[in-house]
Amino acid sequence: LKGKVKLGAGVKLLGNNYIAGDVGPVVIGARTIVYPFACIGYEPQDFKFIGTGLKSAGVVIGTDCLIREHATIHAASHDAPSPPTTIGNKVFLMVSTHIAHDCLIGNNVVLVNGAGVAGHSVLEDNVTLGGNAVIHQFCRIGRMVMMSGDCAVSLDVPPFCMVNERNRIGGLNTVGLRRGGMPREQITELRRAFRDLLRDPMPRARVISEMTERGRSCEPVAEMARFIAASKRGICPGMGKGLRGSRMNASKDGEGMGMDSED
């Protein structure tokens, strides 16, 4: 340990841990367990930090987290008052996982061995990344998303979905929704919305409008609509046949939608 490191009550460091609070402060919440050879708080993989002595807003880790061997969590790329790299509560980072600078990781997130999240990305609550899954920088991954092993995304993934190919949504995470206690009626409405609006290319404005209308009677559908409306990178498309050969760039009119943006 070096520099400004604050450990909450009951934190366990199991030996050969490397925690650097000299680049920026590191705060680790109560009852978190850090396994051997995990590295936390070192400078980001950014050329501007090489030999310059720049300071960072650091790292904040929540309570009851498990950080396994060789996991890495890098400090933010900007100093305070910019936010630190942030890990929520009850996050499980398995062996050799990576959280890059300026990421915001929600609660109850799981990264399986070898998964990596690039800088400035956001993972909302209850996201699971399979082994060796990778997230491009600045991406947003919605609540209760599950990514299969060896997948990669460079576009945003709406809440409640499953990713089973590169930048492709295979369907809803129905098993996760049931385990999370979502009522059957809401799951049914989500499935209808996904089937009707996300499987094939459709104008972004129409998707948001129709999904918002359906969301009046189903909050999870409304949550998905808000996520899509806020997207700046574009949305991973579904597995509909109409997607073959299509380009997923967002235009000015359809910014934030990985679908056709013209009527």
Where are these regions (language model features)?
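Structural signal for interior beta-strand "rungs" in well-ordered beta-sheet cores
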Residues: 1-168
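Terminal amphipathic alpha-helical/low-complexity segments used for targeting or macromolecular assembly
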Residues: 31, 37, 42-58, 64, ...
